[in-house]
A protein has these predicted regions:
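Substrate-gripping "pore-loop 1 plus following alpha2 helix"
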Residues: 220-241, 275
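Loop/turn-to-beta-strand initiation segments
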Residues: 172, 202-206, 243-249
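A short helix-turn-beta junction within AAA+ P-loop NTPase domains corresponding to the substrate/partner-engaging
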Residues: 260-278
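Structural recognition of the conserved hydrophobic beta-strand(s) that form the central parallel beta-sheet
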Residues: 208-210, 233-237, 246-252
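C-terminal alpha-helical "lid" subdomain
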Residues: 5-18, 24-30, 40-44, 49-113, ...
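Pre-Walker A (pre-P-loop) alpha-helix and adjacent loop at the N terminus of AAA/AAA+ ATPase modules
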Residues: 99-146
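Short glycine-rich substrate-engagement loop in P-loop NTPases that contacts/grips substrate
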Residues: 173-202, 229
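Walker A/P-loop
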Residues: 144-175, 195-202
Length: 403
């Protein structure tokens, strides 16, 4: 008699899931086919939850693969302007001599694609493809989008995304913070904006305008009503004049503060959300390098950082690495690491997760074991707590009785 053991009955699916995620980080056609077979087998066995987990891994891997580094070579004849060099002098504020911009050249930009979900990835891929052949578009009397507003919570990777886009276009990035362009000298702010745009329009580059909401903050000052009108008008006029010259990217953490006239100037309005669980796991693994941390540790860090930004996840991983440096992987108490982080960064962790971590350990283990977005196995919980599986099983049973 032949006994068939289903994946569902193994209690090791989280490990299989982690192996699939690691394999799909740089997949071959054969690897992808096997993960797809496993997904289909789970569907056939009537386990849609685990099949959905593998489908998410496949979708996210496809997104990262689509955004893999592939610098575009834009013909000099299709994009006007002179070539920027390291010797090019950036414009400065006439009164204070403060530089109005910083130049980042393509060779200084990391080729590693930022990690986002499938929808954001597809949108970015579409933008880059439209810039791939400007001459082909010109034959149909169309052009790629020349203005893009990227908005979202602080730490979600907006600036990194804009920088990476410039690197993929193989163009220098002229970075200007709008708050630094605003001067206390009457009329100087408008002049600074005009000087910045004149500089960017002269050269083949991507213009990045950071801290866009600083104009709205100035607008709240009743003594600055006249000045802010001049500044906003100068900005709108210069955005209009640049639309036929090159790509302009605006970044803001507070889109609700922007004037509607400013919104209309941007052909693309891209919201960068906080990462979901799958992306948090990918970010945790990326930030963990070069350390090969246990998969259970990485999964827990991703699960506990629900609602966190990429920057906050990176900060937690740094705390984890510091603990490793002092204690080593065999001595690290992962829950203590997270408690330490949650104490120092209490505003970055959800109240629900903090209550679990600082509360009864059995209740935390039960929440992990029954997590809707991918339960933790008894073996994983034992690895997280540093206890044997039988002890963990007793803790789970006690927590169920109490519940």
């Amino acid at each position: 008699m032949t006994t068939t053991t289903t994946i569902e009955g193994m209690d090791h699916f989280p490990i299989i899931q982690a192996l699939c995620r690691a394999a799909m980080a740089s997949p071959s056609v054969a690897v992808r086919r096997q993960v797809e077979r496993l997904r289909d087998a789970l569907i056939a066995e009537g386990d849609p939850k685990q099949a959905k987990a593998l489908a998410s891994i496949l979708d996210n891997a496809e997104g990262v693969q689509e955004m893999a580094p592939s610098r575009l070579t834009i013909s000099k004849t299709s994009l006007p302007g002179e070539t920027l060099s390291p010797n090019t002098q950036v414009p400065v504020d006439r009164e204070t001599s403060t530089p109005l911009a910083e130049i980042i050249f393509p060779r200084q930009i990391n080729d590693q694609a930022p990690l986002f979900g499938p929808a954001i990835t597809a949108a970015i891929k579409s933008l880059l493809e439209e810039w791939r052949d400007l001459e082909a578009l010109a034959r149909y009397d169309v052009a790629p989008p020349k203005t893009c507003l990227i908005y979202g919570a602080p730490g979600t990777g907006k600036t990194r995304l804009a920088t990476w886009i410039a690197g993929q276009l193989d163009l220098p990035l002229v970075v200007a913070r709008l708050d630094s362009l605003v001067s206390s000298f009457l009329g100087t702010s408008s002049r600074n904006i005009g000087t910045l745009f004149s500089f960017a329009n002269r050269y083949r580059c991507v213009l990045l305008l950071d801290e866009f909401d600083s104009l709205a903050k100035l607008r709240d000052d009743p003594q600055e009503v006249g000045e802010i009108k001049r500044v906003v008008n100068a900005l709108l006029q210069n955005l209009d004049s640049r639309k036929d010259v090159g790509l302009t990217i605006g970044i803001t953490n507070h889109p609700q503060l922007l004037d509607s006239a400013v919104w209309r100037r941007f052909e693309i309005q891209l919201e960068v959300p906080r990462p979901d669980l799958a992306i948090r796991q990918d970010l945790t693994r990326q930030f963990m390098a070069p350390i090969d941390a246990p998969a259970a540790h990485q999964r827990l860090l991703a699960w506990l950082t629900e609602g966190a930004t990429g920057a906050e996840i990176e900060a937690l991983v740094r705390t984890y690495k510091r603990s490793l440096a002092f204690g080593g992987p065999e001595k690290i108490d992962l829950l203590d690491v997270f408690r330490h982080f949650a104490t120092l960064h209490s505003g970055r962790i959800s109240d629900e997760k903090k209550a679990l971590v600082f509360g009864n350990q059995g209740e935390l283990l039960l929440a992990l074991h029954e997590a809707q977005d991918g339960k933790f196995s008894t073996a994983e919980l034992a690895e997280i707590t540093g206890r044997d599986k039988s002890t963990v099983s007793r803790q789970l049973a006690a927590a169920r009785e109490k519940d």
